[in-house]
UniProtKB/Swiss-Prot annotation:
Belongs to the cytochrome b family. GO terms for biological process: mitochondrial electron transport, ubiquinol to cytochrome c. This is Cytochrome b. It is a multi-pass membrane protein. Its main location: mitochondrion. It is found in: Mitochondrion inner membrane. It comes from Ommatophoca rossii.
Length: 379
């Protein structure tokens, strides 16, 4: 009798994706982040579901419903903080995952890469709308500032913003629709993640050497299931340390003040994981220019496969490109720091230089360096 996991229509899909999947024998811990993102997504959907049972999406009661969750609901505080800090862990894993893709040339799987970019945008939209829901000062003003950026679009901008708001300012209609979208988008993300995996399994995984590994594949289970469990335990340990010891470390104190349209906070800033893009937005004095730079800071990932000029896939054997990659990482950390600083000297100049460097590395320096490295190989 054939094994049921290989014949049953549903079990067969799971078997071919997580059990008998032929996997390169040399993939490192950098390949753990895909499964960690899956765990983050499941965790966010579950905690979010329980929060939605007690949350009310009305401007008069939203803030107090969060207070009610934290004070009166059994273990409501831990669910709330797991959800808030779970988002931070989600983005840490996301950026690591994208960084791995850039470093090891995984972007040459263009379908998988492009679905990944769509996933990134969808998750960013979900996180932004989730941040608006507690209806604190930073929620309200963050929503006002970011949605207002769309008014920079010529001709239709103002109408578009008012259409999104459902009125002439961020109000009850905005909060209600943001809650609706915040609830539905994680399921869209789940579907996109399945498509992401579907495309990946068409080609098989990349590996650190960048060399085809068809001659040396091992089954996913038990080797990588054990490895993924280790990664998951470390992820949950980090998350719980954050939740139980300093749950507000990554949040903004202003969000503990109920939203007040008549009082603007001194420094409006998004959550830490959007600060790099926010810094790029602020570094351009023109509104439309800033919005375009903001969009391009992520969209630039879509043209990375076109800019690949190297004869080698990954950066494992390309030391000059490695230096550039780590310069890019340092630059993104600098942008993240600048995004959280007030708009004054010297932060403005540092932000502008870091923004220029970000685009220069990706569009100019990396392709040129790859060509130089190709020529070095000939000597």
């Amino acid at each position: 009798m054939t094994n049921i996991r290989k014949t049953h229509p549903l079990a067969k899909i799971i078997n071919n994706s997580f059990i008998d999947l032929p996997t390169p024998s040399n993939i490192s811990a950098w390949w753990n982040f895909g499964s960690l993102l899956g765990i983050c997504l499941i965790l966010q959907i579950l905690t979010g579901l329980f929060l939605a049972m007690h949350y009310t999406s009305d401007t008069t009661t939203a803030f107090s419903s969060i207070t009610h969750i934290c004070r009166d609901v059994n273990y409501g505080w831990i669910i709330r903080y797991m959800h808030a800090n779970g988002a931070s862990m989600f983005f840490i894993c996301l950026y690591m995952h994208v960084g791995r893709g850039l470093y090891y040339g995984s972007y040459t799987f263009t379908e998988t890469w492009n679905i990944g970019i769509i996933l990134l945008f969808t998750i960013m939209a979900t996180a932004f709308m989730g941040y608006v829901l507690p209806w604190g000062q930073m929620s309200f003003w963050g929503a006002t500032v970011i949605t207002n950026l769309l008014s920079a679009i010529p001709y239709i901008g103002t109408d578009l913003v008012q259409w999104i708001w459902g009125g002439f300012s961020v109000d009850k209609a905005t909060l209600t629709r943001f809650f609706a979208f915040h609830f539905i988008l994680p399921f869209v993300v789940s579907a996109l993640a399945a498509v992401h995996l579907l495309f990946l399994h068409e080609t098989g995984s990349n590996n650190p050497s960048g060399i085809p590994s068809n001659s040396d594949k091992i089954p996913f289970h038990p080797y990588y299931t054990i490895k993924d469990i280790l990664g998951a335990l470390l992820l949950i340990l980090t998350l719980m340390l954050l939740v139980l010891f300093s749950p507000d470390l990554l949040g903004d104190p202003d969000n503990y003040t109920p939203a007040n349209p008549l009082s603007t906070p001194p420094h409006i800033k998004p959550e830490w994981y959007f600060l790099f893009a926010y810094a790029i937005l602020r570094s351009i004095p023109n509104k439309l220019g800033g919005v375009l730079a903001l969009a391009l800071s992520i969209l630039i990932l879509a043209i990375i496969p076109l800019l690949h000029t190297s004869k080698q896939r990954g950066m494992m054997f390309r030391p000059i490109s490695q230096c550039l990659f780590w310069l890019l990482v340092a630059d993104l950390l600098t942008l993240t720091w600048i995004g959280g600083q007030p708009v004054e000297h010297p932060y403005i100049t540092i932000g502008q230089l870091a923004s220029i460097l970000y685009f220069t590395i990706l569009l100019v320096l990396m392709p040129i360096t790859s060509i130089i490295e190709n020529n070095i190989l000939k000597w």
